[in-house]
Amino acid sequence: MSTLSPIYSRCATQGNSCPVSTIPEAMAYADPNGTGTIYYRNSEANKAFTCNNASFGNQTNSTAYQCYNGNLPTDFRTAGSSFYENGIPKGWTKCSDENETCDPKVNSDVDILFGADGSYVYSSAKSVPCNINIFGDPKQGVKKACYWRSPLIPINHTPSTPVTPTTPSGTQTTGHKWWVYLLLFGIPLLILIFLIIFFIAKK
């Protein structure tokens, strides 16, 4: 059973549309638990993505599926001629031919591309069936394959917030309290003692 990668977040229930994005996004189609057979597509910029079976190849499922979106890797999303060599993504490793399973066996979600000749659909997964049923057909009429790489940005990576060193407040706070106590109680007490001594001496 496949499990949806945490790069994806639910964007629409079946029959609705995911919000319009100004850039293409990674789309996934899965059950409400993000499990079972998962289908992948790339969305188009500035165009609503309809969440239904037709958008993913007229799939028929026993449960109502939902749509999930995530970020496409920037270098893939903005890919120019330098991203490919003979239509194959540079620096990516072939993991399967069409109609086989891409399984890099690294026990973590990786970047996977399915397609040929510079036309690819993206997924983030541990493994995935490498076929047009799962990815659609990004390049009709030619034999396709799957390629993988480790994500450039670790999945679930949250940039750490710099912590500004602080001086322990104990001494400083204690010092402030000492002066406060002196002003509130010490000086009046000294005045009271002085007055008592003055009246005793006067008698």
From Swiss-Prot:
Topological relation to the membrane, as annotated: Single-pass membrane protein
Keyword Transmembrane helix in annotation: yes
Entry annotated with the keyword Membrane: yes
Cellular-component GO terms for this entry: host cell membrane; membrane; virion component
Chief localisation class: virion
Disulfide bonds: none
Transmembrane segments: 180-200
Compartment(s) where it occurs, according to its Swiss-Prot or TrEMBL record: Virion; Host membrane
Swiss-Prot/TrEMBL keywords: Host membrane, Membrane, Transmembrane, Transmembrane helix, Virion
Protein name: Uncharacterized protein L701
Native species: Acanthamoeba polyphaga mimivirus (APMV)
